[in-house]
Amino acid sequence: DPLSSLFLLIITGIGFLIHFYSTAYMHEEEPMHFGRYFAYLNLFVFSMLLLVLGGNYVVMFIGWEGVGLCSYLLIGFWFKNNNYNAAAKKAFIMNRIGDLGFLLAVFWLIVKLGTVSYASVFAAVGQLSATDITIITTLLFVGAMGKSAQIPLYTWLPDAMAGPTPVSALIHAATMVTAGIYMIARSNILYTMAPATQTLVAIIGLSTAIFAATIALKQNDIKKVLAYSTVSQLGYMFLGLGVGAYTGAVFHVMTHAFFKALLFLGAGSVIHAMHHEQDITKMGGLKSKLPITHLTFLLGCIAIAGVPPFSGFFSKDEILMAAYATNPIFYYVGMGGALLTAFYMFRLYSLTFLGNFRGTAHQQEHLHESPIAMTLPLMVLAFFAVVAGFIGIPELFAPNAHALEHFLAPVFAGSTAIAHAHHIEHATEWILMGTATTIILIVIVYAITKFKKYETAEPNTGIAKVLENKWYIDELYDTVIVKPLYWFASVLKNSVEKLVIDGAVNGVGKLVGYGSRQFRLLQSGQVGSYILMMVMALVLFIIIWFNDNTIMYFIHKIF
């Protein structure tokens, strides 16, 4: 159907470009690891295609688990590094928590409706009570929170930067993180009938968008900034789903796939040129040395900042306008996040490409543009980052020009939430759009002016230190969840494992040993003793043989 076919285009289109780019990026790997990398990458794409092509929740779940496994394999691709292995395990475990929610929702559907086929579930949705629908949608959302990195299950995604950069582009742009959006968009009829869950989705999405954007302000690792940017943009998509703008959310998935893949692959090109340096404070002045990377990266930054007529402007604006129609507070908070996005993206751009070079003399000597296999995908993605928005021109500019809305109409036709109860007046929309664009442009100019002459920075203090350390959420999880679990596990190990389980196993062994030692005492080696035993046994046998009835009667009397 239209929704699956749109995701197919995103997955296969961007997946192909990432495969093509990887041939150059991974050329230094040994042949065995080069082959292993592409095997994992293809399995990843296969799992994602299975996820979006399945006609029921079980097939979706199989694809869902497949992308989880492949992300684990790809994040920990360089398995000799223990930090990378830890990041892979973290991603795997965080996703298992979310997957439990998805699995419970599937079981609930089977118990209540006896089917998991989309067509049957949506046709029979009237048989479910309001409580059932709320529980099912909430459990599905827990699954989406894990896969699409929403509060509180988002911490795996920034650590997923441990994998090769093209993997980061594949996970963050085209595939895994959009799976949660796809699932909720696919289940739009269920969510339309669960307003409480929809509000929860909107609030969590908006909170994540702002929260991740604040962390991105103070990150210096080029891939970490883009990772938190992804978490933030996913928050906007969930905001769109939560306010019933399903088309807007899917539109943003598509435009985000183009500009985020572009930014990640651009970052890969920079890291390649800088001999694997990822700290943007040690870069600068790369504009002249990497002209294609610079220009395409700049276009990606403008697109994600939401400057018209680039693609990010149309999709983000559609979500924010729907948010305004639902609750103006959602709009203003979301707009704050958009300003933060513009600021941290142009901080990243300025520190990387403008000003003086701050790296080593060796790096400066060997700076050169990446090979054509890496720059060609950048140019293709840059083209789409600029023009992809035109398939979703808002009604404000031209009535009935929103091609994507017409294309997706059959999928979302059953959801009444799309027709917002109170539509925004065109005059209000013009004012909001004009004001937002003006402020975003001011923020961009401010960020470039502030960071283009950057030399060295003072160590962060106060709130800046907190943002640099990601609000200490990882440390909080470690203290509140991980360490108590370790303590509980050690208690179980020392009491239940050692005393009860090992005690039972070892006790049986000791009992057998003790019994055998007692029987050994009978084997004295004296022939006379053996003859005596044989005679006694023979006498006993004769007595039983001739008195069997009496003995049986006696036994019956006793028992």
What residue ranges belong to the model's regions?
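Hydrophobic alpha-helical transmembrane segments
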Residues: 2-12, 130-144, 333-338, 416-442
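Hydrophobic core of alpha-helical transmembrane segments in multi-pass integral membrane proteins
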Residues: 16, 106, 210, 434-448
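Hydrophobic transmembrane alpha-helices and their helix-loop junctions in integral membrane proteins
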Residues: 17-63, 69-366, 370, 384, ...
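Alpha-helical transmembrane segments
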Residues: 18-19, 213-215, 348, 442-452, ...
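Hydrophobic alpha-helical membrane-insertion segments
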Residues: 98-107, 300-304, 377-397, 485-495, ...
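Hydrophobic membrane-spanning alpha-helices of multi-pass integral membrane proteins
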Residues: 177, 205, 300-301, 374-388, ...
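Polynucleotide-recognition surfaces of large bacterial nucleic-acid defense/processing enzymes
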Residues: 325-339, 365-385, 399, 411, ...
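Aromatic-capped, Gly/Pro-kinked transmembrane alpha-helices
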Residues: 394-435, 448-559
